[in-house]
Amino acid sequence: MDLIHLEDVDGNRCIVRVTGRSQPGVLTGHDILRADVLVSASFVDARLEMCLSPQDLSSWQQSLAELTQGGNATLGGARGLALGIHVNDERAVSVWVEDPDRLTTTLMIRPPGDWTDEHRGRLQDVREAWPREVVETAPMAYEWIPDHRH
């Protein structure tokens, strides 16, 4: 399921495809999601791995809500790969991907005009497919949310 899917007619694209839970059934990793980051342009074609925490998804939601021309939205970065989107104008965004171990690149994409609304829906779809099922009751202390069936 794609959390991010930015693509244009020139073949430039950046996709963050959520593939599942990182450690299903393990309290400390159950709510961490695995994702593939697919980046493609005339000068790059890469597949990278990313982990997304519930906090990453909340931060992404906040970034999308506040995004305006000249603004930025970011995802990840605390534990490795980071991705950012800068709104150049109403027709183009710059997407940067930084994986400290493998790749740093920036590409320009001209997404459809309603891409932010579409991505709010994508975030909701991801949250519905993999709902939060663990709560941190104290620093480094976790419990299943009541009514969770593990």
What residues fall within each predicted segment?
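N-terminal domain-start interaction segment
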Residues: 1-46, 147-150
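Short, hydrophobic/aromatic-rich segments at coil-to-beta transitions
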Residues: 1-4, 68-72, 93
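Generic "edge-of-domain/loop-turn" microfeature
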Residues: 11, 23, 42-44, 57, ...
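Short amphipathic beta-strand/extended segments with alternating polar/hydrophobic composition
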Residues: 15-19, 45-54, 85, 97, ...
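DNA polymerase processivity clamps
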Residues: 21-26, 68-88, 134-148
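Intrinsic, low-complexity N-terminal interaction/targeting segments
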Residues: 27-34, 77-103
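Short, well-structured hydrophobic secondary-structure segments
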Residues: 30-69
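Mixed-charge, glycine-accented linear interaction segment located at domain edges/termini
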Residues: 100-150
